A protein has these predicted regions:
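Outer-membrane beta-barrel pore domains and translocons
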Residues: 1-3, 26-28, 67-71, 122-126, ...
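Short loop/turn motifs that connect adjacent beta-strands in outer-membrane beta-barrel proteins
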Residues: 17-18, 36, 53-61, 111-116
Length: 153
């Protein structure tokens, strides 16, 4: 909520000391679109993580994370009508639904009291789009950058 008016909640379950699976959910609180950092109202994204660490604390250090992402949101767009004698445009608010797949790399630190800090960056690519005429469908790839703090239970 520091950068965006939204919140992301993550659940991660350890498989062993070097891998885990999880799911994260994002809810956007920018209901009127005044910030327009993200068009998604919500996003649900299951993931799998491979950790590359030689330390005694399991599931920390560098990781690679493939993910799938299911999103829904809304955006505003203009539609233009051109002909020889007349020019017109209308403003529409449209809903979208999308499915994306991607990967990211990151690093996770865990202290002795199990507080966690994590940074990651990656890219996702839309693989299913609802409509080829909307802005969201014109963007086929999107960045994914994350700074997270939390507590390991």
């Amino acid at each position: 909520m520091i950068v965006l008016p939204g919140i992301e909640v993550v659940y991660e379950r350890f498989i062993d000391d070097y891998s885990s699976w999880g799911i994260n959910g994002f809810i956007n609180f920018d209901f009127d679109g005044s910030q327009a950092y993200r068009f998604e109202n919500f996003e649900i994204s299951p993931f799998y993580r491979f950790y590359f660490s030689r330390k005694k604390t399991p599931n920390m250090g560098f990781f690679v994370q493939p993910f799938i992402s299911l999103t829904q949101g809304e955006y505003g767009t203009y539609r233009y009508d051109y002909n020889d004698d007349f020019y017109d445009y209308d403003y529409f608010e449209e809903n979208f639904f999308g499915l994306a797949a991607g990967a990211l790399i990151g690093r996770k630190w865990v202290n002795q009291k199990n507080y966690v800090f994590e940074i990651s960056a990656g890219v996702g690519r839309l693989i299913a789009k609802e409509d080829e005429h909307n802005y969201y469908s014109d963007s086929t790839a999107y960045p994914r950058i994350n700074f997270a703090m939390g507590k390991r239970f």
